[in-house]
Amino acid sequence: MRPNNRENNQPRQIKITRNYTKHAEGSVLVEFGDTKVLCTATVEDAVPRFLKGQGQGWVTAEYGMLPRSTHSRMQREAAKGKQGGRTMEIQRLIARSLRAMVDLKALGERAITLDCDVIQADGGTRTASITGAAVALCDAINGLIENGTLKTNPIKGLVSAISVGIVDGQAVCDLEYVEDSAAETDMNVVMMEDGRMIEVQGTAEGEPFSHEELLTLLDLAKQGCNQIFIAQREALGL
C-alpha cells in the first residue's frame, strides 16, 4: 500500500496559492503533498548579452533548498561558495521547461527569472518547482499585458511536471521521499498541455526497466500531468 493509501496513478494533493508574496511580478506557493516550494517571477527590461539586439526575450530559473527543508540541516550553498551539481542540473531543467511555454520573440527584449525555493522537501521538488513556476510566469506575463507593455500574449500553453517510478515492482506516479529512496526506477516527465513532452529523465536504480515499463510510466506521467493542468487552470481562473 502506498503512503496515504494512494492509488498507483494518483498524484498527491496539489495546492497552488497565487500572490503569495507582494513584491514579485508573480509569486506562487505550490504544494505537492508535504513538498512545498515558493516560486517567484521577476521581470527585467534587459536580456543576456548573447541576445542583445535580437528582438527576443529570455526565461531563466534558479533553484535552492532551505537548510531545514529536509530531515537534517543542509549547509547553504552560498556558505560553501559554489552551487552543487544537482542544483545546477535542476535549475537548468526548470528553465528549459519554462522557455518551452513562451514565444520568446513575442516577449520582446526582456528577461523573466523564476526563483524556486524549496521550503519543505518530501520528494518531487523539481517537478513541483516547474508546476508552480509556470503559474508564476503566467501571472508575470499577464501583468505585462495589463499594463500595456505587451500587446499579445506570448504564452503558448501551460507546462507541468511529475515524477513516476517503479517501487516494489509497481509503476506509480508522484513519488514521496520514502518511495523515491526505494525506487527501482525513477523518472521525471515534463509535458506541454497539448501532450507533447519537453523532457524525460529516467534512471534504473536497480534492475533495468523494459520498453513496456517505460511506456507504462509515460502513460502514468501523462495522466498525472493532466490532473496538474486542471489544478493550474483552476488556480489561474481559466
From Swiss-Prot:
Family matches, as PROSITE patterns: RIBONUCLEASE_PH (PS01277)
Keywords, in A-Z order: Nucleotidyltransferase, RNA-binding, rRNA processing, Transferase, tRNA processing, tRNA-binding
GO molecular function: 3'-5'-RNA exonuclease activity; RNA binding; tRNA binding; tRNA nucleotidyltransferase activity
Pfam families, per database record: RNase_PH (PF01138), RNase_PH_C (PF03725)
Entry-linked Gene3D superfamilies: GHMP Kinase, N-terminal domain
Origin: domain of life: Bacteria
EC id: 2.7.7.56
Enzyme class: transferase
Residues annotated for phosphate binding in this entry: 86, 124-126
One GO BP: tRNA processing
Reactions mediated catalytically: tRNA(n+1) + phosphate = tRNA(n) + a ribonucleoside 5'-diphosphate
Ranges in coiled-coil conformation: none
Role of this protein: Phosphorolytic 3'-5' exoribonuclease that plays an important role in tRNA 3'-end maturation. Removes nucleotide residues following the 3'-CCA terminus of tRNAs; can also add nucleotides to the ends of RNA molecules by using nucleoside diphosphates as substrates, but this may not be physiologically important. Probably plays a role in initiation of 16S rRNA degradation (leading to ribosome degradation) during starvation.
Protein family: Belongs to the RNase PH family.
Entry-linked PANTHER family: EXOSOME COMPLEX COMPONENT, EXOSOME COMPLEX COMPONENT RRP41
HAMAP family given in the database record: RNase_PH
Known partners and oligomeric status: Homohexameric ring arranged as a trimer of dimers.
Name of the protein this chain belongs to: Ribonuclease PH
Organism of derivation: Haemophilus influenzae (strain ATCC 51907 / DSM 11121 / KW20 / Rd)
Organismal lineage: Bacteria, Pseudomonadati, Pseudomonadota, Gammaproteobacteria, Pasteurellales
Gene assigned in the entry: rph
